[in-house]
Regions:
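Flexible coil segments in periplasmic/lumen-exposed cytochrome c-class electron-transfer proteins
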Residues: 30-36, 40, 51, 109-175
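Gly/Gly-Pro-rich "capping" loops immediately C-terminal to redox-active cysteine motifs
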Residues: 36-47, 59, 63-101, 190
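Axial heme c-ligation environment in periplasmic c-type cytochrome domains
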Residues: 64-74, 95-130
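Structural signature of eukaryotic scaffold interfaces centered on beta-propeller domains
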Residues: 146-163, 203-206, 245-254, 294-307, ...
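A short beta-strand motif characteristic of beta-propeller blades
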Residues: 188-193, 229-236, 277-292, 330-337, ...
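Short loop/turn segments immediately following beta-strands, especially the blade-tip
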Residues: 223-228, 271-279, 325-329, 370-374, ...
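Asp-box/WD-like beta-propeller blade repeats and closely related beta-sheet repeat scaffolds
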Residues: 233, 237-317, 330-338, 343
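Loop/turn-rich, solvent-exposed surfaces of beta-rich toroidal or solenoidal domains
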Residues: 399-404, 410-413, 441-526
Protein backbone atom coordinates (compact mmCIF):
# COMPACT_ATOMS: atom_id res chain seq x y z
CA UNK A 1 0.00 0.00 0.00
CA UNK A 2 1.49 3.40 -1.02
CA UNK A 3 2.13 6.21 1.44
CA UNK A 4 -0.64 8.36 -0.07
CA UNK A 5 -3.24 5.63 0.39
CA UNK A 6 -2.09 5.00 3.97
CA UNK A 7 -2.30 8.71 4.68
CA UNK A 8 -5.75 9.15 3.21
CA UNK A 9 -7.07 6.19 5.22
CA UNK A 10 -5.68 7.63 8.41
CA UNK A 11 -6.30 11.32 7.85
CA UNK A 12 -9.68 11.67 6.21
CA UNK A 13 -10.65 14.28 8.74
CA UNK A 14 -8.70 16.99 10.45
CA UNK A 15 -8.11 19.04 13.52
CA UNK A 16 -10.62 20.78 15.74
CA UNK A 17 -10.03 23.01 18.76
CA UNK A 18 -7.79 21.28 21.35
CA UNK A 19 -5.28 23.69 22.81
CA UNK A 20 -1.91 24.09 24.46
CA UNK A 21 -0.44 21.54 26.83
CA UNK A 22 1.18 23.96 29.21
CA UNK A 23 2.06 23.63 32.87
CA UNK A 24 1.70 19.88 32.96
CA UNK A 25 4.66 19.57 30.62
CA UNK A 26 6.83 21.66 32.87
CA UNK A 27 6.65 19.04 35.62
CA UNK A 28 9.59 16.68 35.74
CA UNK A 29 9.02 13.10 34.69
CA UNK A 30 11.32 10.11 34.87
CA UNK A 31 12.43 8.66 31.52
CA UNK A 32 10.14 5.89 30.36
CA UNK A 33 10.62 2.96 28.04
CA UNK A 34 9.05 3.15 24.61
CA UNK A 35 5.43 2.03 24.51
CA UNK A 36 4.55 -1.19 22.72
CA UNK A 37 4.35 -0.74 18.95
CA UNK A 38 0.88 -0.15 17.56
CA UNK A 39 -0.81 -2.57 15.21
CA UNK A 40 -1.84 -1.32 11.77
CA UNK A 41 -5.48 -0.96 12.89
CA UNK A 42 -4.49 0.85 16.08
CA UNK A 43 -2.29 3.25 14.15
CA UNK A 44 -5.02 4.03 11.62
CA UNK A 45 -7.49 4.76 14.43
CA UNK A 46 -4.98 6.87 16.37
CA UNK A 47 -4.05 8.82 13.25
CA UNK A 48 -7.72 9.63 12.66
CA UNK A 49 -8.22 10.82 16.25
CA UNK A 50 -5.05 12.89 16.13
CA UNK A 51 -6.18 14.75 13.03
CA UNK A 52 -9.66 15.28 14.42
CA UNK A 53 -8.58 16.52 17.82
CA UNK A 54 -4.87 17.39 18.03
CA UNK A 55 -3.16 18.43 14.79
CA UNK A 56 -4.57 21.95 14.78
CA UNK A 57 -2.52 22.96 17.80
CA UNK A 58 0.35 20.48 17.84
CA UNK A 59 1.02 20.24 14.09
CA UNK A 60 1.00 17.43 11.55
CA UNK A 61 4.65 16.65 12.34
CA UNK A 62 3.97 17.23 16.07
CA UNK A 63 6.53 20.01 16.36
CA UNK A 64 4.06 22.22 18.24
CA UNK A 65 2.68 25.74 17.79
CA UNK A 66 -0.21 26.83 20.01
CA UNK A 67 0.24 23.42 21.63
CA UNK A 68 3.49 21.86 22.83
CA UNK A 69 5.94 19.75 20.83
CA UNK A 70 4.72 16.12 20.86
CA UNK A 71 7.71 14.41 19.30
CA UNK A 72 9.09 11.34 21.12
CA UNK A 73 12.34 13.20 21.75
CA UNK A 74 13.40 16.78 21.18
CA UNK A 75 16.28 19.08 22.08
CA UNK A 76 16.60 22.83 22.02
CA UNK A 77 19.24 25.42 22.77
CA UNK A 78 18.57 27.73 25.70
CA UNK A 79 19.64 31.40 25.80
CA UNK A 80 22.59 30.53 28.05
CA UNK A 81 23.90 28.07 25.45
CA UNK A 82 22.91 24.92 27.30
CA UNK A 83 20.75 22.19 25.79
CA UNK A 84 17.32 21.16 27.06
CA UNK A 85 15.84 17.77 26.25
CA UNK A 86 12.28 16.52 26.42
CA UNK A 87 9.64 14.55 24.60
CA UNK A 88 6.71 12.23 24.98
CA UNK A 89 8.96 9.27 25.80
CA UNK A 90 10.36 11.16 28.76
CA UNK A 91 6.87 12.01 30.00
CA UNK A 92 5.76 8.39 29.80
CA UNK A 93 2.43 6.77 29.02
CA UNK A 94 0.82 7.27 32.45
CA UNK A 95 1.58 10.99 32.55
CA UNK A 96 0.43 11.45 28.97
CA UNK A 97 -2.86 9.71 29.73
CA UNK A 98 -3.52 12.13 32.60
CA UNK A 99 -2.77 15.16 30.42
CA UNK A 100 -5.04 13.91 27.63
CA UNK A 101 -7.85 12.96 30.00
CA UNK A 102 -7.90 15.99 32.28
CA UNK A 103 -6.37 18.80 30.22
CA UNK A 104 -4.17 21.54 31.63
CA UNK A 105 -4.50 25.00 33.14
CA UNK A 106 -2.71 26.33 30.07
CA UNK A 107 -5.80 26.01 27.88
CA UNK A 108 -5.94 22.38 26.73
CA UNK A 109 -9.41 21.00 27.34
CA UNK A 110 -10.13 17.63 28.94
CA UNK A 111 -10.80 14.77 26.54
CA UNK A 112 -12.21 12.24 29.00
CA UNK A 113 -15.74 13.25 27.95
CA UNK A 114 -14.87 12.85 24.24
CA UNK A 115 -12.52 9.86 24.13
CA UNK A 116 -12.93 6.50 25.85
CA UNK A 117 -10.36 5.25 28.36
CA UNK A 118 -8.98 2.87 25.72
CA UNK A 119 -8.73 5.69 23.17
CA UNK A 120 -6.87 7.89 25.66
CA UNK A 121 -4.41 5.04 26.26
CA UNK A 122 -4.06 4.55 22.51
CA UNK A 123 -3.27 8.22 21.95
CA UNK A 124 -0.67 8.21 24.73
CA UNK A 125 1.08 5.34 22.94
CA UNK A 126 0.65 6.89 19.49
CA UNK A 127 2.37 10.18 20.31
CA UNK A 128 5.35 8.23 21.68
CA UNK A 129 5.98 6.90 18.16
CA UNK A 130 7.83 8.86 15.48
CA UNK A 131 5.26 10.71 13.32
CA UNK A 132 4.85 9.74 9.68
CA UNK A 133 5.63 12.40 7.09
CA UNK A 134 2.53 12.80 4.91
CA UNK A 135 2.75 13.17 1.12
CA UNK A 136 2.88 16.38 -0.87
CA UNK A 137 -0.04 17.73 -2.91
CA UNK A 138 0.69 19.35 -6.26
CA UNK A 139 -1.17 21.66 -8.63
CA UNK A 140 -2.02 18.62 -10.77
CA UNK A 141 -3.54 16.77 -7.82
CA UNK A 142 -5.41 19.91 -6.77
CA UNK A 143 -6.76 20.29 -10.30
CA UNK A 144 -7.73 16.61 -10.45
CA UNK A 145 -9.94 17.14 -7.37
CA UNK A 146 -11.69 20.20 -8.84
CA UNK A 147 -15.39 19.93 -9.69
CA UNK A 148 -17.81 22.47 -11.13
CA UNK A 149 -21.27 21.24 -10.16
CA UNK A 150 -23.15 24.17 -11.70
CA UNK A 151 -21.35 26.05 -14.51
CA UNK A 152 -21.34 29.85 -14.31
CA UNK A 153 -23.51 30.04 -17.46
CA UNK A 154 -26.23 27.97 -15.75
CA UNK A 155 -26.31 29.94 -12.51
CA UNK A 156 -29.01 32.55 -11.79
CA UNK A 157 -28.61 36.04 -13.22
CA UNK A 158 -30.36 37.51 -10.19
CA UNK A 159 -31.35 36.41 -6.69
CA UNK A 160 -34.00 33.69 -7.12
CA UNK A 161 -35.08 33.41 -3.48
CA UNK A 162 -36.77 35.97 -1.23
CA UNK A 163 -34.37 35.63 1.68
CA UNK A 164 -32.78 38.66 3.32
CA UNK A 165 -29.28 37.52 2.37
CA UNK A 166 -27.60 40.32 4.33
CA UNK A 167 -28.85 38.73 7.53
CA UNK A 168 -28.22 35.11 6.57
CA UNK A 169 -25.85 33.13 8.82
CA UNK A 170 -23.48 30.43 7.58
CA UNK A 171 -23.18 28.11 10.59
CA UNK A 172 -20.52 25.43 10.92
CA UNK A 173 -21.92 22.02 11.94
CA UNK A 174 -18.60 20.69 13.09
CA UNK A 175 -19.10 16.94 13.45
CA UNK A 176 -21.31 16.32 10.41
CA UNK A 177 -19.24 18.05 7.71
CA UNK A 178 -21.97 20.56 6.89
CA UNK A 179 -22.94 24.19 7.14
CA UNK A 180 -26.45 25.33 7.96
CA UNK A 181 -27.68 28.48 6.24
CA UNK A 182 -29.97 30.06 8.82
CA UNK A 183 -32.29 32.98 8.11
CA UNK A 184 -31.41 35.69 10.62
CA UNK A 185 -34.87 37.24 10.38
CA UNK A 186 -37.01 34.13 10.87
CA UNK A 187 -34.40 31.86 12.57
CA UNK A 188 -35.33 29.10 10.09
CA UNK A 189 -32.78 26.78 8.51
CA UNK A 190 -33.00 27.54 4.79
CA UNK A 191 -30.50 24.94 3.64
CA UNK A 192 -28.03 22.41 5.04
CA UNK A 193 -25.09 21.98 2.69
CA UNK A 194 -22.56 19.15 2.64
CA UNK A 195 -19.04 20.54 2.89
CA UNK A 196 -15.63 19.48 4.10
CA UNK A 197 -15.15 18.09 7.60
CA UNK A 198 -15.22 20.47 10.59
CA UNK A 199 -15.51 23.69 8.60
CA UNK A 200 -13.15 26.27 10.07
CA UNK A 201 -14.49 29.46 8.51
CA UNK A 202 -16.94 30.84 5.98
CA UNK A 203 -15.92 33.88 3.94
CA UNK A 204 -18.02 36.03 1.61
CA UNK A 205 -17.24 37.27 -1.86
CA UNK A 206 -17.07 41.03 -2.26
CA UNK A 207 -20.44 40.96 -4.03
CA UNK A 208 -22.05 39.02 -1.16
CA UNK A 209 -23.28 36.35 -3.58
CA UNK A 210 -20.86 33.52 -2.84
CA UNK A 211 -19.87 31.83 0.42
CA UNK A 212 -16.46 30.16 0.48
CA UNK A 213 -16.38 27.36 3.05
CA UNK A 214 -13.11 25.66 4.00
CA UNK A 215 -13.14 22.30 5.81
CA UNK A 216 -10.27 21.06 7.91
CA UNK A 217 -9.87 18.15 5.51
CA UNK A 218 -8.80 20.66 2.83
CA UNK A 219 -12.09 20.65 0.94
CA UNK A 220 -13.16 24.09 -0.28
CA UNK A 221 -16.83 24.52 -1.22
CA UNK A 222 -18.40 27.44 -3.09
CA UNK A 223 -22.05 28.14 -2.19
CA UNK A 224 -24.24 30.32 -4.42
CA UNK A 225 -26.72 32.28 -2.27
CA UNK A 226 -28.69 33.46 -5.33
CA UNK A 227 -30.10 30.02 -6.06
CA UNK A 228 -33.69 29.29 -5.05
CA UNK A 229 -32.22 26.92 -2.48
CA UNK A 230 -28.57 27.90 -1.90
CA UNK A 231 -26.23 25.04 -2.76
CA UNK A 232 -22.64 24.14 -3.61
CA UNK A 233 -21.76 25.06 -7.20
CA UNK A 234 -18.04 24.17 -7.18
CA UNK A 235 -15.51 22.46 -4.94
CA UNK A 236 -11.82 21.58 -4.80
CA UNK A 237 -9.47 19.88 -2.35
CA UNK A 238 -6.56 22.23 -1.63
CA UNK A 239 -4.61 19.89 0.68
CA UNK A 240 -4.98 17.35 3.46
CA UNK A 241 -5.46 19.88 6.27
CA UNK A 242 -6.57 23.49 5.81
CA UNK A 243 -7.96 26.47 7.73
CA UNK A 244 -8.13 29.67 5.73
CA UNK A 245 -9.79 31.17 2.66
CA UNK A 246 -10.60 34.61 1.27
CA UNK A 247 -11.37 36.33 -2.01
CA UNK A 248 -10.19 39.31 -4.05
CA UNK A 249 -11.93 42.51 -2.88
CA UNK A 250 -9.99 45.37 -4.50
CA UNK A 251 -11.90 47.46 -7.05
CA UNK A 252 -11.74 45.82 -10.47
CA UNK A 253 -10.95 42.39 -9.00
CA UNK A 254 -14.22 41.77 -7.12
CA UNK A 255 -14.97 38.00 -6.99
CA UNK A 256 -12.21 37.33 -9.57
CA UNK A 257 -9.87 35.25 -7.40
CA UNK A 258 -9.95 33.10 -4.29
CA UNK A 259 -7.07 31.97 -2.09
CA UNK A 260 -6.95 29.07 0.38
CA UNK A 261 -4.15 28.20 2.79
CA UNK A 262 -3.19 24.73 4.02
CA UNK A 263 -1.68 23.32 7.17
CA UNK A 264 -0.48 20.34 5.14
CA UNK A 265 1.17 20.61 2.77
CA UNK A 266 2.33 24.05 3.94
CA UNK A 267 1.24 26.12 0.93
CA UNK A 268 -1.48 28.33 -0.47
CA UNK A 269 -3.55 27.91 -3.63
CA UNK A 270 -4.83 30.72 -5.85
CA UNK A 271 -8.02 29.92 -7.77
CA UNK A 272 -10.63 31.41 -10.05
CA UNK A 273 -13.18 33.09 -7.79
CA UNK A 274 -16.32 31.86 -9.56
CA UNK A 275 -15.29 28.30 -10.41
CA UNK A 276 -12.43 27.47 -7.97
CA UNK A 277 -10.27 26.35 -10.88
CA UNK A 278 -6.73 26.10 -9.44
CA UNK A 279 -4.29 28.58 -10.98
CA UNK A 280 -1.19 28.54 -8.82
CA UNK A 281 0.23 26.70 -5.79
CA UNK A 282 2.86 28.45 -3.66
CA UNK A 283 4.85 26.71 -0.92
CA UNK A 284 5.39 28.48 2.42
CA UNK A 285 8.36 26.41 3.57
CA UNK A 286 11.32 28.53 4.55
CA UNK A 287 13.20 30.28 7.30
CA UNK A 288 11.69 31.43 10.57
CA UNK A 289 12.19 34.91 12.01
CA UNK A 290 14.99 33.29 14.05
CA UNK A 291 16.82 32.21 10.89
CA UNK A 292 16.09 28.49 11.13
CA UNK A 293 14.53 26.35 8.40
CA UNK A 294 11.08 24.97 9.24
CA UNK A 295 9.56 22.03 7.31
CA UNK A 296 5.95 22.72 8.27
CA UNK A 297 5.17 26.46 8.28
CA UNK A 298 1.38 26.35 8.13
CA UNK A 299 -0.88 29.02 6.64
CA UNK A 300 -2.79 30.32 9.64
CA UNK A 301 -5.10 33.11 8.50
CA UNK A 302 -5.73 35.10 5.34
CA UNK A 303 -7.51 38.43 4.91
CA UNK A 304 -8.21 40.48 1.80
CA UNK A 305 -7.43 44.18 1.49
CA UNK A 306 -9.87 46.60 -0.09
CA UNK A 307 -7.19 49.29 -0.45
CA UNK A 308 -4.78 47.27 -2.63
CA UNK A 309 -4.98 44.10 -4.76
CA UNK A 310 -3.39 42.16 -1.91
CA UNK A 311 -4.01 39.32 0.48
CA UNK A 312 -2.41 39.27 3.92
CA UNK A 313 -1.21 35.69 4.44
CA UNK A 314 0.03 34.76 7.93
CA UNK A 315 2.54 31.91 8.23
CA UNK A 316 2.27 30.31 11.63
CA UNK A 317 5.63 28.67 12.41
CA UNK A 318 7.93 31.12 10.60
CA UNK A 319 6.38 34.27 12.05
CA UNK A 320 6.39 35.78 8.55
CA UNK A 321 3.48 37.87 7.25
CA UNK A 322 3.14 37.79 3.46
CA UNK A 323 1.51 40.53 1.39
CA UNK A 324 0.55 38.68 -1.80
CA UNK A 325 -0.14 41.00 -4.77
CA UNK A 326 -2.69 39.29 -7.04
CA UNK A 327 -2.70 41.95 -9.78
CA UNK A 328 -0.38 39.74 -11.87
CA UNK A 329 -0.70 36.07 -10.89
CA UNK A 330 1.90 34.83 -13.40
CA UNK A 331 4.50 37.25 -12.06
CA UNK A 332 3.46 37.04 -8.43
CA UNK A 333 4.93 39.66 -6.10
CA UNK A 334 5.14 38.81 -2.42
CA UNK A 335 6.33 41.14 0.35
CA UNK A 336 7.66 39.27 3.39
CA UNK A 337 7.33 40.99 6.76
CA UNK A 338 9.08 39.63 9.84
CA UNK A 339 6.99 39.59 13.00
CA UNK A 340 6.94 36.89 15.72
CA UNK A 341 6.00 33.22 16.23
CA UNK A 342 3.52 31.57 16.04
CA UNK A 343 1.06 33.58 13.97
CA UNK A 344 -2.58 32.61 14.26
CA UNK A 345 -5.72 34.67 13.68
CA UNK A 346 -6.44 38.38 13.48
CA UNK A 347 -8.44 41.15 11.89
CA UNK A 348 -8.51 44.69 10.56
CA UNK A 349 -8.56 47.83 12.64
CA UNK A 350 -11.46 50.24 12.14
CA UNK A 351 -9.71 52.06 9.27
CA UNK A 352 -9.02 48.78 7.37
CA UNK A 353 -5.44 50.02 6.86
CA UNK A 354 -3.83 48.03 9.65
CA UNK A 355 -4.02 44.29 10.16
CA UNK A 356 -3.47 42.93 13.68
CA UNK A 357 -2.61 39.26 14.22
CA UNK A 358 -1.82 37.16 17.28
CA UNK A 359 1.67 35.71 17.61
CA UNK A 360 0.39 33.54 20.39
CA UNK A 361 3.52 31.58 21.31
CA UNK A 362 5.37 34.89 21.71
CA UNK A 363 2.48 36.49 23.61
CA UNK A 364 2.41 39.40 21.19
CA UNK A 365 0.16 41.12 18.67
CA UNK A 366 1.78 42.03 15.35
CA UNK A 367 0.38 45.04 13.49
CA UNK A 368 1.00 45.49 9.75
CA UNK A 369 0.57 48.74 7.86
CA UNK A 370 -0.78 47.49 4.54
CA UNK A 371 -0.43 50.96 3.01
CA UNK A 372 3.36 51.04 3.46
CA UNK A 373 3.84 47.26 3.42
CA UNK A 374 5.77 47.31 6.68
CA UNK A 375 5.45 46.12 10.25
CA UNK A 376 3.85 48.90 12.30
CA UNK A 377 4.33 47.42 15.77
CA UNK A 378 4.88 44.35 17.92
CA UNK A 379 2.86 44.69 21.10
CA UNK A 380 3.48 42.57 24.19
CA UNK A 381 0.34 41.11 25.75
CA UNK A 382 -0.71 38.59 28.35
CA UNK A 383 -0.36 34.89 27.64
CA UNK A 384 -1.57 33.36 24.33
CA UNK A 385 -3.67 36.07 22.69
CA UNK A 386 -6.51 34.65 20.58
CA UNK A 387 -8.56 37.42 18.95
CA UNK A 388 -10.55 35.63 16.29
CA UNK A 389 -10.99 38.75 14.14
CA UNK A 390 -10.81 40.97 17.21
CA UNK A 391 -13.22 43.80 18.02
CA UNK A 392 -13.06 47.52 17.14
CA UNK A 393 -14.67 50.30 19.16
CA UNK A 394 -14.10 53.78 20.59
CA UNK A 395 -12.83 53.80 24.14
CA UNK A 396 -14.12 56.71 26.28
CA UNK A 397 -10.54 57.63 27.27
CA UNK A 398 -8.25 56.25 24.56
CA UNK A 399 -10.25 56.61 21.35
CA UNK A 400 -10.13 53.87 18.67
CA UNK A 401 -9.05 50.52 20.10
CA UNK A 402 -8.86 46.91 18.93
CA UNK A 403 -9.55 44.11 21.40
CA UNK A 404 -8.26 40.57 21.81
CA UNK A 405 -9.01 37.88 24.35
CA UNK A 406 -6.54 35.30 25.64
CA UNK A 407 -6.38 31.55 25.96
CA UNK A 408 -3.83 31.80 28.74
CA UNK A 409 -5.04 34.72 30.86
CA UNK A 410 -8.29 36.09 32.25
CA UNK A 411 -8.19 39.46 30.49
CA UNK A 412 -9.36 41.16 27.32
CA UNK A 413 -6.55 43.36 26.03
CA UNK A 414 -7.33 46.73 24.42
CA UNK A 415 -4.76 48.20 22.00
CA UNK A 416 -4.92 51.79 20.74
CA UNK A 417 -5.01 51.99 16.92
CA UNK A 418 -4.13 54.98 14.70
CA UNK A 419 -6.75 57.19 13.09
CA UNK A 420 -6.43 59.92 10.44
CA UNK A 421 -9.52 61.73 11.69
CA UNK A 422 -8.59 65.23 12.95
CA UNK A 423 -10.56 64.72 16.15
CA UNK A 424 -8.51 61.63 17.01
CA UNK A 425 -5.10 63.37 16.95
CA UNK A 426 -5.19 63.64 20.75
CA UNK A 427 -5.05 59.84 21.00
CA UNK A 428 -1.85 59.46 18.95
CA UNK A 429 0.29 59.17 22.10
CA UNK A 430 -1.46 55.87 22.90
CA UNK A 431 -1.12 54.24 19.47
CA UNK A 432 0.12 50.63 19.51
CA UNK A 433 0.10 50.53 23.29
CA UNK A 434 -1.95 48.30 25.57
CA UNK A 435 -4.23 50.91 27.11
CA UNK A 436 -6.40 48.63 29.24
CA UNK A 437 -6.67 45.01 30.34
CA UNK A 438 -10.31 44.29 31.02
CA UNK A 439 -10.84 41.60 33.64
CA UNK A 440 -12.51 38.50 32.17
CA UNK A 441 -14.10 35.82 34.36
CA UNK A 442 -11.50 33.25 33.28
CA UNK A 443 -8.87 32.27 30.73
CA UNK A 444 -9.76 30.15 27.70
CA UNK A 445 -11.23 32.88 25.49
CA UNK A 446 -11.53 32.29 21.74
CA UNK A 447 -13.63 35.20 20.45
CA UNK A 448 -14.46 38.81 21.30
CA UNK A 449 -17.08 40.72 19.35
CA UNK A 450 -18.90 44.02 19.07
CA UNK A 451 -20.75 45.98 16.36
CA UNK A 452 -20.74 49.66 15.28
CA UNK A 453 -24.37 50.00 16.38
CA UNK A 454 -23.84 48.29 19.74
CA UNK A 455 -22.74 49.62 23.12
CA UNK A 456 -21.59 46.19 24.29
CA UNK A 457 -18.49 44.01 24.08
CA UNK A 458 -18.99 40.23 24.23
CA UNK A 459 -16.42 37.54 25.04
CA UNK A 460 -16.57 33.76 25.47
CA UNK A 461 -14.28 31.37 27.41
CA UNK A 462 -15.05 27.91 25.97
CA UNK A 463 -11.59 26.50 26.66
CA UNK A 464 -11.77 27.15 30.40
CA UNK A 465 -11.81 23.90 32.44
CA UNK A 466 -14.47 25.24 34.82
CA UNK A 467 -17.97 24.24 33.65
CA UNK A 468 -19.67 27.46 34.79
CA UNK A 469 -17.12 29.66 33.00
CA UNK A 470 -16.99 27.56 29.80
CA UNK A 471 -20.79 27.55 29.52
CA UNK A 472 -21.05 31.34 29.91
CA UNK A 473 -20.28 34.55 28.03
CA UNK A 474 -19.42 37.92 29.52
CA UNK A 475 -20.84 41.26 28.37
CA UNK A 476 -19.35 44.67 29.16
CA UNK A 477 -20.73 48.17 28.58
CA UNK A 478 -18.00 49.78 26.47
CA UNK A 479 -18.61 53.09 28.25
CA UNK A 480 -17.64 51.47 31.57
CA UNK A 481 -15.31 48.49 31.34
CA UNK A 482 -14.47 48.40 35.04
CA UNK A 483 -16.75 45.43 35.61
CA UNK A 484 -18.96 43.14 33.53
CA UNK A 485 -22.41 44.36 32.70
CA UNK A 486 -23.61 40.77 32.89
CA UNK A 487 -22.30 37.21 32.96
CA UNK A 488 -24.71 35.06 30.95
CA UNK A 489 -24.93 31.29 31.43
CA UNK A 490 -25.80 30.24 27.89
CA UNK A 491 -26.20 26.58 28.83
CA UNK A 492 -28.93 27.41 31.34
CA UNK A 493 -30.59 29.85 28.95
CA UNK A 494 -30.79 27.11 26.31
CA UNK A 495 -33.22 25.11 28.45
CA UNK A 496 -31.43 21.89 27.51
CA UNK A 497 -30.70 19.27 30.19
CA UNK A 498 -27.23 19.17 31.71
CA UNK A 499 -24.90 16.61 30.16
CA UNK A 500 -21.72 14.82 31.26
CA UNK A 501 -19.74 16.82 28.72
CA UNK A 502 -19.27 20.54 29.29
CA UNK A 503 -21.48 22.46 26.87
CA UNK A 504 -19.16 25.21 25.69
CA UNK A 505 -20.58 28.63 24.81
CA UNK A 506 -18.60 29.82 21.82
CA UNK A 507 -18.39 32.48 19.12
CA UNK A 508 -20.76 35.42 19.73
CA UNK A 509 -21.83 36.82 16.35
CA UNK A 510 -23.96 39.90 15.67
CA UNK A 511 -26.88 40.17 13.30
CA UNK A 512 -26.43 42.52 10.36
CA UNK A 513 -28.17 45.41 12.11
CA UNK A 514 -26.35 44.89 15.41
CA UNK A 515 -29.49 44.23 17.46
CA UNK A 516 -28.94 40.52 18.16
CA UNK A 517 -26.05 38.34 19.28
CA UNK A 518 -26.00 34.63 18.39
CA UNK A 519 -24.01 32.28 20.65
CA UNK A 520 -23.33 28.60 19.92
CA UNK A 521 -23.74 26.05 22.68
CA UNK A 522 -21.32 23.34 21.60
CA UNK A 523 -22.11 19.99 23.21
CA UNK A 524 -20.97 16.47 22.53
CA UNK A 525 -21.67 14.89 19.15
CA UNK A 526 -24.51 12.80 20.61
CA UNK A 527 -25.92 15.65 22.72
CA UNK A 528 -28.47 18.22 21.59
CA UNK A 529 -26.72 21.48 20.73
CA UNK A 530 -28.23 24.92 20.34
CA UNK A 531 -27.77 28.47 19.16
CA UNK A 532 -29.06 30.97 21.71
CA UNK A 533 -30.06 34.35 20.27
CA UNK A 534 -29.88 37.36 22.60
CA UNK A 535 -31.27 40.87 22.39
CA UNK A 536 -28.13 43.02 22.52
CA UNK A 537 -29.84 45.84 24.46
CA UNK A 538 -31.74 43.87 27.09
CA UNK A 539 -29.39 40.83 27.14
CA UNK A 540 -32.44 38.58 27.27
CA UNK A 541 -33.10 35.47 25.20
CA UNK A 542 -35.05 36.06 21.99
CA UNK A 543 -34.84 32.57 20.51
CA UNK A 544 -33.25 29.18 21.12
CA UNK A 545 -32.55 27.31 17.87
CA UNK A 546 -32.42 23.56 18.55
CA UNK A 547 -33.22 21.80 15.30
CA UNK A 548 -32.21 18.09 15.52
CA UNK A 549 -30.33 18.46 12.23
CA UNK A 550 -28.10 21.10 13.81
CA UNK A 551 -25.28 19.06 15.38
CA UNK A 552 -22.35 20.78 17.15
CA UNK A 553 -22.86 24.29 15.73
CA UNK A 554 -19.66 26.29 16.14
CA UNK A 555 -18.69 29.32 14.05
CA UNK A 556 -21.54 31.49 12.78
CA UNK A 557 -20.79 33.95 10.01
CA UNK A 558 -23.31 36.68 9.28
CA UNK A 559 -23.25 37.46 5.56
CA UNK A 560 -23.22 41.27 5.80
CA UNK A 561 -20.77 41.50 8.69
CA UNK A 562 -18.39 38.98 7.13
CA UNK A 563 -18.66 40.58 3.69
CA UNK A 564 -17.70 44.00 5.09
CA UNK A 565 -15.29 42.90 7.87
CA UNK A 566 -17.48 44.28 10.63
CA UNK A 567 -16.34 43.25 14.09
Amino acid sequence: MGIRKQWLMGAAVVAALPLAISQAYAQAAAPAAAAAALTADEKANAKKIYFERCAGCHGVLRKGATGKNLEPHWTRKLPDGSTQEGGTLKLGKDRLEKIIAYGTEGGMVNFDDILSKDEIGLMARYIQETPDVPPEYSLKETTDSWKVLVPVSERPKKQMNKFNLKNMFSVTLRDTGEVALIDGDTKEIRSIVKTGYAVHISRLSKSGRYVYVIGRDGRLSLIDLWMEKPAVVAEVKVGFDARSVDTSKFKGFEDKYAIAGSYWPPQYVIMDGETLKPIKVVSTRGMTVDGEFHPEPRVASIVSSEKKPEWVVNIKETGQILLVDYSDIKNLKVTTIESAKFLHDGGWDASKRYFLVAANASHKIAAVDTQTGKLAALIDTKKIPHPGRGANFRHPTYGPVWATGHLGDAVVTLISTPSDKPGDAKYKQYNWKVVQEVKHNGAGNLFVKTHPKSKNLWADAPQNPDREIAESVVVWDMADLSKPKKVINVAKDSGLPQTKAIRRAVHPEYSADGTEVWVSLWGGKTDQSAIVVYDDKTLTVKKVITDPKMITPTGKFNVYNTQHDIY
